[in-house]
């Protein structure tokens, strides 16, 4: 099954891929906010295609809308008017454009802290 974290990773990858060719050298983007609706189960081996569209640009802030659909064999048997049945997930991703070196330098200065285990995890 396609888990929600993997669906989010695919969505972020689509946003990054659409943005990267437009960034100046030395610049990158970092995620700041995500809204994700996981709408449909996707069996192992299902082909998923994610489309991302820039919907807002405000200074360094970019907001993308994305939709993840079943394609290929996992979409077989659905008529064109059944598009909603093929949607595995949809949502939005907000990213901020940053200078890569400055961002990494600031991150390296932050003290690292252990991440606490969630309750019930041995």
Label each residue range with its predicted role.
Residues 12, 27-32, 59-62:
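Generic structural signal for well-ordered secondary structure
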């Amino acid at each position: 099954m396609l888990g929600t974290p993997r669906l989010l990773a695919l969505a972020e990858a689509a946003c990054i891929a659409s943005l990267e060719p437009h960034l100046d050298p030395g610049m990158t983007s970092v995620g700041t906010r995500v809204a994700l609706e996981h709408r449909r189960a996707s069996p192992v081996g299902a082909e998923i295609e994610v489309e991302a569209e820039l919907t807002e640009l405000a200074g360094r802030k970019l907001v993308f809308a994305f939709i993840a659909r079943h394609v290929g064999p996992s979409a077989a048997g659905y008529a064109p008017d059944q598009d909603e049945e093929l949607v595995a997930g949809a949502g939005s991703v907000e990213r901020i454009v940053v200078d890569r070196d400055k961002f990494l330098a600031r991150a390296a200065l932050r003290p690292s802290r252990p991440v606490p285990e969630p309750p019930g995890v041995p």
